[in-house]
Amino acid sequence: MERLADRVILVWGFKRSLLAIAAGAFAVLALPPFGFFAAMFLSFTLLVWLIDGAAASPDSGLVGRLWPAFATGWLFGFGYFVAGLWWLGHALLVDQDEFAWALPLAILGLPACLAIFYGLAVALARIFWSDGMGRIAALAAGFGLMEWLRSVVLTGFPWNAIGYGMMPVPLMMQSAHVIGAMGVTALAVFVFSAPALAGTRQGARNGTALAVLLFAAHLGYGAYALYVAPRAEALPEDKRPVVRLVQPDIDQAAKMDNDADRNAIFETHLKLSAETPKNGGRKPDIIVWPETAIPFILTDNQDALTRIADTLDDNQILIAGAVRAEEMGPGTPTRYYNSIYVIDGRGQIIAASDKVHLVPFGEYLPFEDLLTEFGIQNVVEMPGGFSAAVSRHLLALPGGLNLYPLICYEIIFPDEMTSDIEDANAILNITNDAWFGATPGPYQHFQQARVRAVETGLPLIRDANSGISAIVNAQGEIIAGLDLEQTGFIDATVDRFGLEAGTTFPRQTYFWLTEALLILIALVSRRGFISGLN
């Protein structure tokens, strides 16, 4: 092991850059749809050894001393994000005549920008670097901090945070309920980096023992949470509301075609909603359609509301994604919102919620006045783009069920869960992942949604146009679901009483405590290392 470590530490030039990129790319095997979490042991072991060799002249100043470490982290991140996000280019090929030119920006440009966070994580860790356990603690703290920053800087984009590689199955997701996904990221980097200690001997015994203990605690808490969950207070099966998820699997190109038969798309949703329950099951109390399922402005189409009323029973509720238009008065452009409507059995809209966190360059154009001068436009064709809602609120349904609405990629942001999550009975996530076809993207999106359920202790109702649609319990376990690119529906019950829902505050507190402990370990280790040199 020491010989291998020495070879990696001493590698230089192009081979060093290639090895850093390859290590980052290999780590993606830990993410959906693969879920091979052991891949990250190799990736982070190589990263630690590469940082060991990222030396600079002591006279080169702070920036000069940290630059080799930053470059190593950036190369690792570039490989990770190119391998993990290449599928974003698929969305640009839906209308390739308009957007194919942007493929290099999506496949290489975005990863290059996101990799800056990993470069900063490694540079920060290098400040506390020492020849022992402290260096993997410093690396874990650096990644934890930078993954958190990645979720909040500018509009934020925490997709594929390292921690998700340590949460491939519900058993390994439960720690997120305590320390959140970012806390699991810090834990994961420490554990995945531990084999690197065997290559330098210094601190290997204590560091490895601590990593094994933390990993065992991670698994042990997961087993405990899954064991006690079925014993939590719950409604009897026949008293739980039945939810139908409609998955029409309509091709995105057809949805964007201005000449498409929009009534046919609408009727597809109605037909699936009216299907007889399978195996003699109860009729659904709630029917859910995916994001932007209604292919026209619903409030301008009374016939469509009448068709919905004809399809629903009096006591049924439809929750549907739609574009909402808001007239602003003479001389002011109409505002459009990516919205959720709640419609009762009489065809009346009884509640609505608008998307707060819009997708840059997809639903709105940052610096619009400047960029439109260069011919750059939104992927979603909407005059002026979508408008963002100021805040979101619970969807209160008849019968006392409160849903916390998140549209599309809003579900990937841990900090989107505000304090009113405590009053929710379930998370509602509607999305349209047909943009990305049968690529890893929809699988990654679904995993992050499952982790939000675990974090909050709430069941998840997730409906996607082309999949993956599912009812997920508060422990991230799939109760019922439809896989990618399947057409159909599922009926399942949703228990209103899962584990007690937490707030964002305790998880954030425990995350920062985790960060502080890791930095303390790094400082103590470095102090001991420096003392040993004197």
Swiss-Prot record:
GO terms for biological process: lipoprotein biosynthetic process. The chain crosses the membrane at residues 18-38, 39-59, 74-94, 105-125, 127-147, 178-198, 209-229, 504-524. GO terms for cellular component: plasma membrane. It is found in: Cell inner membrane. One of its GO terms (molecular function) is N-acyltransferase activity. Residues 246-496 form the CN hydrolase domain. InterPro entries: Apolipo_AcylTrfase (IPR004563), C-N_Hydrolase (IPR003010), C-N_Hydrolase_sf (IPR036526), LNT_N (IPR045378). The active site is at 291 (proton acceptor), 355, 408 (nucleophile). The keyword Acetylation does not apply. Its main location: membrane. Keywords: Acyltransferase, Cell inner membrane, Cell membrane, Membrane, Transferase, Transmembrane, Transmembrane helix. The keyword Acyltransferase applies. It is a multi-pass membrane protein. Its EC number is 2.3.1.269. Catalyzes the phospholipid dependent N-acylation of the N-terminal cysteine of apolipoprotein, the last step in lipoprotein maturation. Belongs to the CN hydrolase family. Apolipoprotein N-acyltransferase subfamily. NCBIfam families: lnt. This is Apolipoprotein N-acyltransferase. It comes from Rhizobium leguminosarum bv. trifolii (strain WSM2304). The lineage of its organism: Bacteria, Pseudomonadati, Pseudomonadota, Alphaproteobacteria, Hyphomicrobiales.
